Amino acid sequence: SEAEDKLKTVIQIDPDYADGFMRLGILYLQQERYSEAVENLSYSTKIDKKDFNKFFNLASAYNYMKEWDKAVTAAQSCIDIKKRFGGGWLELGIAEMGRKNKTRAKRHFEEARKDRDWRKMAERKIDEINNPAKYEK
């Protein structure tokens, strides 16, 4: 894609441009190219260890790949940087659901709920735990 080509050019010119790697990772996430997303997002967190958003997107990519332990680590890094960001708590909860730890997951979704931007998604996840039959396909 054109966006992919431009981002690849940008990071070739400046291999320390963490946001370029993050944006490429997000693009791959959207395209469901999860291993490439992880590769770029992981690299972006090595360059810039202070941006919660990079760790949030990395956690999301790991969750899509069902790499629960790595998702937990990335989500925890996100939360350590920005405690009130609901997205980090949501990804942490999703990873705990993957680990079959519903009690812990619910606690994390309750934290995510405190962030207005993430409330609806968190409430949906809590409802999935409380009423699993409703969501069975």
Regions found by a protein language model. Name each.
Residues 16, 50-51, 84, 117-118:
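Short coil loop/turn residues that delineate tetratricopeptide repeat
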Residues 10, 17-30:
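N-terminal leader/targeting helix
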Residues 13, 47, 81, 114-115:
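Structural marker of alpha-solenoid helical repeat scaffolds
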Residues 1-9, 30-43, 64-77, 99-111, ...:
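Structural signature of tandem alpha-helical TPR/SEL1-like repeats
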